[in-house]
Amino acid sequence: MALSPLAPSEFPAIPNVQGVQLAVHASGMRYSGRDDLCLVVLSSGSIVGGAFTQSLCPSAPVDWCKKVIKGGSARTLLCNAGNANAFTGKAGQEVVESSAISLAGLIDVNPEDVFLASTGVIGEPFPPSDLVEHLPELVGKLQEADQDNWLAAANAIRTTDTFPKGSFAKINGTGAVVAGIAKGSGM
């Protein structure tokens, strides 16, 4: 696939963000030989906000996040690339619930503080074990967020994207850094 003409010449040097840990892992669910799971762990007391699709048919992870965001706190975000877990019915809900409960147990948080995202093909259910069996190894790879693992995380969430996307901003005079990765537009 050709690199998008919108691709920057290099990935931004996203700084370490205190209280954020990242990990990536190759589950092999869809892709061979590349990371397709991304885990973000946030320090206790982190607050979450969200904007969700207006689709009448959101994915199972979107339904989960709409439900748990009402609590206002977040400790983790788990994203898998390759399967959107959309139009998967009860099977998709089981993947979401199993993933949240398993991950919460591994890092000692409440399942309601686990946020999930999936990207990829639509309408292909998969068993919860395809994702859950990789969580212990993924958790074992957690490291403080730095320039290298921000890039690895941005690459792990890619599907048909031709380049990884990330950005950050320092809030003047506060020492605060807002950082993020994305996928999609300008792929």
Task: Give residue spans per PLM region.
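N-terminal amphipathic/basic leader segments beginning at the initiator methionine
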Residues: 1-53
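Structured core elements
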Residues: 38, 63, 78, 177-180
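Short, ordered loop/turn segments at secondary-structure junctions
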Residues: 44, 67, 82-84, 119-121
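Glycine-rich oxoanion-binding loops at beta->alpha junctions
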Residues: 47, 52-70, 158-172
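Short active-site-adjacent helix-start/loop capping segments
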Residues: 47-49, 71-72, 85-88, 123-126
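Glycine- and acidic-rich phosphate- and metal-coordinating loops
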Residues: 75-82, 113-119
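Alpha-helical support elements that line or immediately flank enzyme active sites
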Residues: 78-108
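Glycine-rich, mobile lid/loop segments that gate access to catalytic sites or pores
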Residues: 97, 102-187
